[in-house]
Each structure stands twice: as C-alpha cells, then as structure tokens.
Curated annotation (Swiss-Prot):
Classification via InterPro entries: CRISPR_associated_Cas2, Virulence_VapD/CRISPR_Cas2
The family this protein is said to belong to: Belongs to the CRISPR-associated endoribonuclease Cas2 protein family.
Keywords: Antiviral defense, Endonuclease, Hydrolase, Magnesium, Metal-binding, Nuclease
Record field: transmembrane: none
Name of the protein described by the UniProt record: CRISPR-associated endoribonuclease Cas2 1
One GO BP: defense response to virus
Binding-site positions, Mg(2+): 11
NCBIfam families for the chain: cas2
Obligatory cofactor(s): Mg(2+)
Enzymatic class: hydrolase
Lineage start: Archaea, Methanobacteriati, Methanobacteriota, Stenosarchaea group, Methanomicrobia
Any GO MF annotation of the entry: RNA endonuclease activity
Pfam families recorded: CRISPR_Cas2
CDD domains per UniProt: Cas2_I_II_III (cd09725)
C-alpha cells in the first residue's frame, strides 16, 4: 500500500467555507502547520477520496485549494522554522 505525503494550501474568503475546508482536512488526519497550510500522509485510496470530496463540496470559485503530493526525499529535507515538523502520519487501510 502506497502512502502519499501531502501539503494542502487554501485561500478561502468566508469563515463558514474556511471552517468547512479545515474540518475536511482534519477528518483525513492532516495537521495544520500554518494558518492556511496542512500536511500529512494518506494512502492512495484515502487521497483519491479526499480529492473527490474536495472537488464535490467546494465548487465556489472563491474557494481555492491546492493539494501537492510530496516525495519521500522532499519530506525528509523539509524544514519548518521555529517549530518541529509533525511526524509523518502513516495510515494503513484494513481491507
């Protein structure tokens, strides 16, 4: 099972919409590292589910969400100044 590391950034004007984006990202186990940036790791299946949900639920042009897959080597070199990066969240899917 392949685990994908992610960085998700968003720009959402309305508080109600922004809170909904945050709840979805937290539901999938992503961790907030900056005000509008989350990171974490998901299985390919969970990543596809999250992306489908984001596309389905956030259709307003004013809601901008960027999901970036990050390779293992890049995650190892990542630096978060003045804080520690959250431990990579390894999630497993029971089939």
């Amino acid at each position: 099972m392949t685990v994908k590391h992610l960085i998700v950034c968003y720009d959402v004007e309305k508080t109600k919409d922004r809170n909904k984006v945050i709840k979805v990202l937290e539901y999938y186990g992503l961790i907030r590292v900056q005000y509008s940036v989350f990171m974490g790791s998901l299985t390919e299946t969970r990543l596809h589910q999250m992306n489908a949900r984001i596309k389905r639920e956030f259709t307003k042009p004013s809601i901008k969400i960027l999901v970036i897959e990050v390779c293992n080597a890049c995650m190892e070199r990542a630096l978060l100044v003045h804080e520690e990066l959250p431990k990579v969240n390894r999630q497993f899917e029971v089939i």
